[in-house]
Structures are given as structure tokens and as C-alpha cells.
Design a protein with these regions (language model features):
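Extended acidic/polar, glycine-enriched regions
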Residues: 1-2, 6-8, 13
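LRR N-terminal entry segment and analogous cap-like coil->beta motifs
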Residues: 11, 16-22
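Glycine- and acidic/polar-rich repeat regions and solenoidal domains
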Residues: 2-5, 20-42, 51-61, 72-319
Length: 321
């Protein structure tokens, strides 16, 4: 059987069930509120275990609420699809893509497409074989907040060829093990998107792989709300910790570099902990050390400390309490 729940009825509630071992193909969910072009709106998916299904665990639709579910071990992906006014909160989303679908296509924790007013908050997203949380293609007015995103194979949070978003108060660590070429192992990746604010996140890069927070620009064309360009993005008041030699943070392009670097993208008031501040841990018109990054007008009011100096400062502050 492909689906546990399939249909276009409105205001359906699915609560307190174990939904497992359905033979849903890729891009289809064990919970699937659509038939052809007809969609069921206003579904509430609450307090379920959704596991071990072959394709996707939950496909979204307009007005869906997904809360307090255990979405683990699904063959392709935990949660995904198209819908407006969707809330995804307080779920555990883990160990998805056991079937080994191509992570750069559509696999891992959750992937949202063509959403408006999507809210993703307080989820524990870990050990997915792909990106942890991913908005890809014409998403706008997105909020990611208070999520705990760790140890996913791809980027932790990725906002790609999309528009206005806020990424705030998230904890990200150890993401990017399976996709560490160039910037594809970033903890937070803003890719060909505009008007994104990234603030008050804690980001930790593994000593052997991964990157911090990156803005990236490539040739990607245009979408529903305008060109897919990396402009008007503001990264501020985040703490980025590099545990070892691996990783950088900043902005990079493989096309039309000036649009990226002259496009009102800015890093302000961020703090960094690094093995040494003379290491090339920052990227802006090339890879640079801390002084070089600030010389480009980035994070002029930010701070960077070695792990040793940070420990000394922290101990001094503790002693004064």
C-alpha cells in the first residue's frame, strides 16, 4: 500500500498514530493530502510516529500544521512539497533517506518548495542523509527559528533560489559531512536568494569538515518574484565556532562576482571563535584572515578570538561574578 492517508478532504486531523512501512514512491508521502491537482487544506498532523516509509513521510499542503511528530527513517525524506501558511514545529526529523536518493536532488530531512509564510520552529533535525532543512524554489516570507540542526550529511539550513526569509535563534553543529566540496557543507547556506536576515544563531563547524554561514551566487535565472540573485542579505549577531582547521565563512560566487560583493550583502556584529585569528577562515573577494575580512568592510563591529583567548576571557568573567 502506497499511502496511509490520501485525499483532498479539508480540515483532517491525524493524531497519535504509528504510520510505518508504506510503499510510497519518491516524492509521495505516507501522508499525502493531494490527488492530481486537487489538494486537501487545513490538515493537522500531531503526535504521530511516521517512520520506515519508502518515499516521504509527510507531504505538505496549504494550511497544514505538523507538530510534535517523530519523523524518522523514511526512505527519501521526512517532510516536503508545496503549500502556503504551513507550520512545522516541535518535531524530531532524523535518519531520513535510508534508501540513498541523491541528496542534491531531493532527500534528507525536509524540503519545501514554492511556499509562502512557512514557519519551521523548535524542531530537532539530525542525522539525515542530505540537507537538514531546505527551502528550494520560490519560497517567500519564510521563518526558521529555534531549531536544533546537527550532524546532517548536507547543509544544516539551506535557502535556495528563493526570497525573503528570517533565519534566527537556531543551533547548528556538525552538518556537511557528506557534501563538503566548496561551500556545500555550510551550517547555514543562503544560495541565490535575496532579502534574507540571518541572526542570533549558534553555528559550530566540525574540526574535519563543514563551513559556517555562507552567501553563494551562481547563474540560476529568475523565478516567480524576480531574479535568483544573492543581494540584500544581512548576517548579524551570530556566533560561529571553528573547532579546527576545516571550514570558512562569508560569501562566494562562481558567476558575476560583483553582483554578490556590491549587492548590499553584509556581515555585522558577528562573533567568531577560531584556533587562531591569523587563519584564513573568512571569504570575501577571496579567502582571508580576520583583519583581511574586516578590511573589506565586513564585521567591522564584530569580534574574533582564539579558543585560548576566549577561554581566558570567559574564566575572568566567571571570576568576577
Amino acid at each position: 500500500t502506497r499511502h496511509a492517508f490520501l485525499g483532498t478532504a479539508r480540515d483532517v486531523t491525524i493524531r497519535g498514530l504509528i504510520i510505518e512501512k508504506y510503499a510510497s514512491p519518491a516524492q509521495y508521502g505516507a501522508i499525502h493530502p493531494r490527488v492530481g491537482n486537487e489538494v486537501g487544506t487545513g490538515w493537522r498532523i500531531e503526535g504521530n510516529a511516521i517512520r520506515w516509509n519508502h518515499g516521504c513521510g509527510i507531504r505538505i499542503a496549504d494550511g497544514m500544521y505538523i507538530g510534535r511528530n517523530y519523523v524518522v527513517g523514511n526512505g527519501q525524506m521526512g517532510i516536503g512539497d508545496i503549500g502556503n501558511d504551513v507550520v512545522v514545529e516541535d518535531n524530531e526529523i532524523a535518519w531520513n533517506n535510508y534508501a540513498g536518493y541523491a541528496a542534491e536532488w531531493e532527500a534528507g530531512g525536509a524540503k519545501f518548495v514554492k511556499t509562502n509564510r512557512l514557519v519551521v520552529r523548535r524542531n530537532y533535525v539530525h542525522n539525515n542523509r542530505g540537507t537538514g532543512l531546505w527551502t528550494d524554489i520560490d519560497n517567500i516570507n519564510t521563518i526558521y527559528e529555534f531549531n536544533h540542526v546537527v550532524d546532517n550529511w548536507g547543509p544544516g539550513i539551506q535557502h535556495e533560489i528563493s526570497y525573503d526569509a528570517v533565519i534566527r535563534h537556531n543551533y547548528l553543529r556538525g552538518n556537511g559531512r557528506g557534501g563538503d566540496a566548496w561551500v556545500w557543507g555550510s551550517q547555514i547556506l543562503v544560495q541565490n536568494s535575496q532579502n534574507v536576515e540571518v541572526h542570533d544563531n549558534y553555528v559550530e563547524v566540525n574540526e574535519d569538515y563543514g563551513d559556517g554561514i555562507f552567501l553563494v551566487y551562481q547563474r540560476r535565472g529568475s523565478g516567480r518574484y524576480g531574479p535568483y540573485i544573492t543581494v540584500n542579505n544581512w548576517v548579524h549577531h551570530n556566533e560561529v565556532v571553528f573547532k579546527g582547521n576545516a571550514g570558512t565563512t562569508g560569501a562566494a560566487a562562481d558567476f558575476d562576482h560583483e553582483t554578490l560583493y556590491s549587492g548590499n550583502n553584509r556581515f555585522n556584529n558577528n562573533g567568531y571563535r577560531v584556533p587562531r585569528t591569523d587563519m584564513n577562515k573568512w571569504e570575501w573577494r577571496g579567502v582571508r584572515n580576520w583583519i583581511g575580512f574586516q578590511s573589506q568592510g565586513q564585521d567591522v563591529a564584530g569580534w574574533a578570538l582564539s579558543h585560548r583567548d576566549y577561554a581566558i576571557l570567559t574564566n575572568q568573567e566567571e571570576g568576577q561574578k
